[in-house]
């Protein structure tokens, strides 16, 4: 029999679909396991093999847990709102819905070809009205709890894209999407009050089985700092409040720096300095916050011409404006202590400001006694507490906790996003839509370009925007901003628990059964924002009594990047691998230009993506799945090599030939059972530990040992086929039936490992005739002498035929020698 994956894989994919083999059920008599991928944005480029690493890992776990008797939820859906589809609509006039649906169909086809065991009945897209009806409802929950509000904000506005961008979507003054110029402008926006949950989001990290670097990134993003708020008197009447985490260095202050957007900055500018300062502020407004706080940026600033009084020494402290200070953190004013802060030192040296040493090399306070302020000799927490107590007594400050985390700018000036379900009235009030008014659908439009600054495409459709509100009998105006792509992905994991519910986003019963997500796998690029936003929404739901767990994701794994060889003409761009060739050790393009050859992240832009469909057609999905794991540890970067897929295909060919061999018999063989039980034990342990890259090697080692047997015990191979099923499910299903079992290997369960077989109880006897090696036999260690001699005579019978055996030499567990 010949192994033909093109026939086998199609056959079993149709079987699984017909029998709904992976439908998840809430079974009270089974433990549950919820394994989830970070669902993809369905781009026009489709999937490359780099995307499949995480999907293959979750599928292996899902199939393994089903076999172990768990009720498994393993769904897939589509994060389908987003800017690329809208930009394509602007260029072509094609409705984003059409583009998105076409892309989803392509993604679905690619994933299906891999044999992933998704519960297809739970699939949805965030752009489905049946889904975003509930996204709108959940936004209104935030609104009702005072966690969604409108405010005038300095935003990153991209005229070319016609929308506001988050700080993470801007780099070096340009949009990451398209590389267009970005400006800072004031705009009235919807904001989510994520800062209300700062402490809960911090504390919740402690109990999570997440990579420590991800938890640290979130801690840093939230940025909790304990310190003091210090008041510096300005113009003998007003105070400028400064937050510091190091009040013990207060006497080392030689300047103050205020953020350009601080509301009091205008009052601090001396008239003879106004033109220069305002010009600087104007320039600062064109920069993104990321660019402003970059460590590598040369410090810039301008003196306001105004001084503040030091609260301890009474010295005049110059007030400067600099764009490295951000209004949203602390008070928007920092005290410059250049002797003990590297950033302050750079600023002081740039502008020739004084530097005062107030800590010795061991951190003890020096040069800090002034009148009744006696700080010298104190250290660390004791020194800080002394300063705070002194300031409180003099009404010049108090202790304070500050956070870097700022409220979440939520609205976007786009068409392809969830409409925000709010009606505004002329008197400044607004009304949230009621349940019977949801989902609020966007109007059908022909022109997807923005209306102008602060107005998305929806603002053009006057008949949709301007309405008579029947609920209040008033003239109103619909909100024309839409939600960001983050909105739909903040809660999708909950919808999968109850995807067909038309009465609520999920039922309490099903949420309680499935949550939390037991294993969540996705890219490290989502380490902060998606995970933080999802945790925030989940905490709100928890406080509202809507979910049973305070945290959504129990265990998180970030899969590593998949690298592939890229070829680039310096100064021009990338070329396809098929347009590159090596000539005397130098890589050249077909146009005759020398190439830079690198190992880079697989991506469409670098022309080094590998289409999985091509590999499936050549080698089969099972070989691709196996190599996807064999290529390296799940959480590490790995270099892709198509030859590795070919190697896995050769292994599967060999395994297929082994199981279908005429040597397979219904016998009990200790060595064969030992090899099978040892393999199953190893594979189970490796899946539990997520050491998936070592599994293919274990199977290869098994085959190399197993083929040495004279007869292949069928029961041992049945165990091994079941153990292979999570990794290579199609060939396993086929071989399972060839061995005489009913279809549906998942239902057969995970093979039980008998501890007695984990120790190799067989030994290899050397069988000699007149001292010459004639055979080797694997025989049980416990076999009696006569049993061994009987087996040995049978093995070398042709050498003994018609001969007289004069002597039988027997060495236990080692040797039999027949002397003629």
UniProtKB/Swiss-Prot annotation:
It comes from the Bacteria. Disulfide bonds: none annotated. A motif ('KMSKS' region) lies at residues 601-605. It catalyses: tRNA(Leu) + L-leucine + ATP = L-leucyl-tRNA(Leu) + AMP + diphosphate. SUPFAM superfamilies: Anticodon-binding domain of a subclass of class I aminoacyl-tRNA synthetases (SSF47323), Nucleotidylyl transferase (SSF52374), ValRS/IleRS/LeuRS editing domain (SSF50677). One of its GO terms (molecular function) is ATP binding. Its EC number is 6.1.1.4. One of its GO terms (cellular component) is cytosol. InterPro entries: aa-tRNA-synth_I_CS (IPR001412), Leu-tRNA-ligase (IPR002302), Leu_tRNA-synth_edit (IPR025709), M/V/L/I-tRNA-synth_anticd-bd (IPR013155), Methionyl/Leucyl_tRNA_Synth (IPR015413), Rossmann-like_a/b/a_fold (IPR014729), tRNAsynth_Ia_anticodon-bd (IPR009080), Val/Leu/Ile-tRNA-synth_edit (IPR009008). CDD domains: Anticodon_Ia_Leu_BEm (cd07958), LeuRS_core (cd00812). It is an enzyme of class 6 (ligase). The keyword Cytoplasm applies. Keywords: Aminoacyl-tRNA synthetase, ATP-binding, Cytoplasm, Ligase, Nucleotide-binding, Protein biosynthesis. GO terms for biological process: leucyl-tRNA aminoacylation. A motif ('HIGH' region) lies at residues 40-51. ATP binds at residue 604. It is found in: Cytoplasm. Belongs to the class-I aminoacyl-tRNA synthetase family. This is Leucine--tRNA ligase. It comes from Chlamydia felis (strain Fe/C-56) (Chlamydophila felis). The lineage of its organism: Bacteria, Pseudomonadati, Chlamydiota, Chlamydiia, Chlamydiales.
């Amino acid at each position: 029999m010949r192994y033909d994956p093109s026939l086998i894989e199609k056959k079993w994919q149709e079987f699984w679909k017909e029998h709904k083999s992976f439908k998840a059920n809430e079974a009270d008599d089974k433990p549950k396991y919820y394994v989830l991928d970070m669902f993809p944005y369905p781009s026009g480029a489709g999937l490359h093999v780099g995307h499949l690493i995480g999907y293959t890992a979750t599928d292996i776990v899902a199939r393994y847990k089903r076999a172990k008797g768990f009720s498994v939820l393993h769904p897939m859906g589509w994060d389908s709102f987003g800017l690329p589809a809208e930009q394509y609509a602007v260029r072509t006039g094609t409705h984003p819905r059409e583009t998105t649906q076409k892309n989803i169909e392509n993604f679905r086809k690619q994933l299906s070809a891999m044999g992933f065991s998704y519960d297809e009945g739970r699939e949805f897209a965030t752009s489905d009205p049946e889904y975003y009806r509930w996204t709108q409802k959940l936004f209104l929950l935030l609104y009702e709890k005072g966690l969604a509000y409108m405010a005038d904000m300095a935003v990153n506005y991209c005229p070319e894209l016609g929308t506001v961008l988050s700080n993470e979507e801007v780099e070096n003054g340009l949009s990451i999407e398209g590389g267009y110029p970005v400006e800072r402008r004031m705009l009235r926006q919807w904001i989510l009050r994520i800062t209300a949950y700062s402490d809960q989001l911090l504390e919740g990290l402690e109990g999570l089985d997440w990579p420590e670097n991800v938890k640290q990134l979130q801690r840093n993003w939230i940025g909790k700092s304990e310190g003091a708020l210090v008041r510096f008197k300005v113009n003998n009447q007003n105070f400028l409040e400064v937050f510091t985490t190091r009040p013990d260095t207060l006497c080392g202050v030689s300047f103050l720096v205020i953020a350009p957007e601080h509301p009091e900055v205008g009052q601090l500018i001396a008239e003879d300095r106004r033109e220069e300062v305002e010009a600087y502020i104007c320039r600062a407004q064109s920069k993104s916050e990321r660019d402003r706080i970059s460590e590598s940026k040369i410090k810039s600033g301008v003196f306001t011409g105004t001084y503040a009084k030091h609260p301890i020494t009474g010295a005049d402290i110059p007030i400067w404006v600099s764009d490295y200070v951000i209004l949203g953190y602390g008070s928007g004013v920092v005290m410059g202590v250049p002797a003990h802060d590297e950033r302050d030192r750079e600023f002081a040296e740039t502008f020739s400001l004084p530097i005062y040493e107030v800590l010795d090399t061991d951190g003890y306070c020096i040069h800090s006694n002034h009148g009744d302020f006696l700080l010298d000799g104190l250290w660390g927490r004791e020194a800080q507490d002394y300063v705070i107590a002194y300031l409180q007594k003099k009404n010049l400050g108090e202790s304070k906790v500050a956070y870097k985390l700022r409220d979440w700018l939520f609205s976007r000036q786009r068409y392809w996003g969830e409409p925000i379900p709010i009606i505004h009235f002329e008197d400044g009030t607004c009304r949230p839509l009621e349940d019977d008014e949801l989902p609020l659908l966007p109007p059908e439009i022909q022109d997807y370009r923005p209306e102008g600054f602060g107005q998305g495409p929806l603002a053009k459709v006057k008949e949709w925007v301007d309405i008579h509100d029947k609920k209040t009998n008033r003239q109103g105006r619909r909100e024309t901003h839409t939600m960001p792509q983050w909105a739909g992905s903040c809660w999708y994991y909950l919808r999968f628990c109850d995807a067909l519910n038309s009465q609520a986003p999920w039922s309490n019963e099903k949420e309680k059964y499935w949550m939390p997500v037991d294993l969540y796998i996705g890219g490290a690029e989502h380490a902060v924002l998606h995970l933080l936003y999802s945790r925030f929404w989940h905490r709100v739901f928890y406080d509202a009594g809507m979910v049973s767990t305070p945290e959504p994701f129990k265990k998180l794994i970030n899969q590593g990047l998949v690298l592939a060889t890229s070829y680039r003409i310096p100064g021009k761009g990338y070329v396809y691998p098929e347009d590159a060739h090596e000539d005397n050790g130098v890589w050249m393009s077909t146009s005759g230009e020398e190439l830079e050859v690198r190992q880079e992240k697989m991506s469409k832009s670098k022309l080094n993506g590998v289409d999985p469909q091509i590999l499936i057609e050549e080698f089969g999905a099972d070989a691709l799945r196996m190599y996807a794991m064999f290529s390296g540890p799940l959480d590490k970067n790995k270099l892709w090599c198509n030859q590795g897929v070919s190697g896995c295909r050769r292994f599967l060919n060999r395994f297929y030939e082994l199981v279908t061999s005429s040597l397979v018999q219904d016998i009990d063989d200790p060595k064969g059972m030992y090899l099978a039980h040892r393999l199953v034990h190893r594979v189970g342990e490796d899946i539990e530990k997520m050491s998936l890259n070592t599994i293919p090697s274990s199977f290869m080692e098994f085959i190399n040992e197993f083929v040495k047997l004279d007869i292949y015990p069928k029961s041992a191979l049945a165990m091994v086929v079941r153990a292979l099923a999570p990794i290579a499910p199609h060939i396993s299903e086929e071989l399972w039936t060839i061995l005489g079992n009913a279809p549906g290997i998942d239902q057969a369960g995970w093979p039980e490992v008998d501890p007695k077989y984990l120790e190799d109880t067989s030994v290899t006897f050397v069988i000699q005739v007149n001292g010459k090696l004639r055979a080797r036999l694997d025989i049980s260690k416990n076999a009696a002498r006569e049993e061994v001699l009987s087996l040995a005579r049978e093995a070398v019978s042709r050498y003994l035929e018609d001969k007289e055996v004069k002597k039988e030499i027997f060495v236990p567990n080692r040797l039999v020698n027949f002397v003629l």
